[in-house]
Amino acid sequence: MHILEQRIRNAHAEGRTALIPFITAGFPSSEGFRTALADLDSHGADTIEIGIPFSDPVADGPVVEEASRRALAAGVTLDGILKELRAHPCLRAATVLMGYLNPILQYGTEAFARDAAAAGVSGCIIPDVPLEESAELRALLKERGIALIPLVAQNTDEARMRAYAAVSEGFVYVVSVMGTTGVRNSLPPQVLDTLRRARAAFPLPLALGFGLHDPAQLAAIPEDARPDAAVFGSSLLRHLDEGKSAASFLELWKK
């Protein structure tokens, strides 16, 4: 069993939803990022999703986009992110990199797979790599024990879900809304259908993201559709930008 799947299964065995916070590398500052990473790791994050800043983040909402802009302006690079992660070899939480293909191509796909593995990365989410174009990169990552995480949404049909299921490991990222990331007051009713269809198509645990900001949103989801993990980013980034700690934010999700 892949480590990302194991972390979520372990949380389920403890009777809880796995927590996957998202933070942009280098945000709100280099030191602030290091502190947030350590706080999330020591306060119960099962997996930490780390955003690779990019100048044209098509799947990201305004909060994540602004965090990326500020990180890029501060000189954050993919090489620097991997070096930073190598400096934290004792993280309890698993780590997943979320980014776009262009920086990875510039880095070199083979070098990226090698160096990401050396940095302890367990998974990658790359929204602009469709299934049909993912085989080579998926194979390079898999050789290093890194899962390429699939994203599914309300417009992903059953045939495509099954095609993803045939090659995927780790977990499935279920997108709660059409469009970009960001805080929403409520989840659309269509997400229940997406979760149920994904549950039927995949043997892997489901992580729900895009728009989550309150544990009450999860509690409102019927048991038969409830995800195994929650991904939250924009609300955490706002919390950090206000000078508050990642630890205090995570405690809100553990209550």
Describe each model-derived feature in a short phrase:
Residues 16, 45, 121, 169, ...:
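A structural motif
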Residues 30-42, 156-167, 202, 208, ...:
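Catalytic cores of alpha/beta
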Residues 146-182:
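Histidine/lysine/aspartate-rich catalytic loop segments that bind and position anionic ligands
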Residues 1-11, 30, 54-66, 72-86, ...:
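Active-site-adjacent beta->alpha loops and helix N-cap segments on the catalytic face
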